[in-house]
Amino acid sequence: MTGEWVGEIAAIALAAILAITLHEAAHGFAAKALGDSTAAEMGRVSLNPIRHIDLVGTILLPAFLLVSQLLTIGRVEAMFGWAKPVPVNIWRLRNPRWGMVLVAAAGPAINFALAWGFGLAAHGVTALADSLPEDGTEWLLRFIALSMLYNVILACFNLLPLPPLDGGRILVGILPAPLARAVAGLERFGLLIVIGLVFVLPHLITGFDPLGALIRNVALPVLRFMFMLAGHGG
């Protein structure tokens, strides 16, 4: 059991770190390409996970969820967390309005691309299965499946139209100015709203589970599409 837990924790941690790191790095690379070097000047245009770690969102909360689920139900059914946001100065972008839309979209876009790429990688692991240890093959396929799942969930969650999530910033960029200002004004409360919806209200209202609904009704259909796009049947 201990060995299985170690393998499961390693697969979960690596999949989550890759998804979060590349998501944040994509924002930084996009901002730099579009004229804003703020993130680059702060060392955030980087593939080094340490530069994107948030103590609570990347370490403490995911660790608590991971350990509590393994100890209570013996498996991991849900994870939640966040990285340190990449700083972007929209006024340094060559086109502040549409530049911010593209910078915000870069994070979810890289997650969708990674999900598809891991789906393709599964073919390679399967083809090499006879020359790999059985445990190694199983672990790699588990890691690939988790990577696809986490990347799709991270992308779908971040596309929710609520600042400071990417979807909210995209919405601000495409709405007419009066509506954009109203939506942008929600950003100061955005994290509190998300925490309330994901953690607080589900404990107070029976059957209220917006994160579960997002996963079931949006992320899992997208995941199935990614599997098909990667050539894993219909």
Give the positions of each predicted feature.
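Hydrophobic transmembrane alpha-helices and their immediate loop junctions
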Residues: M1-G234
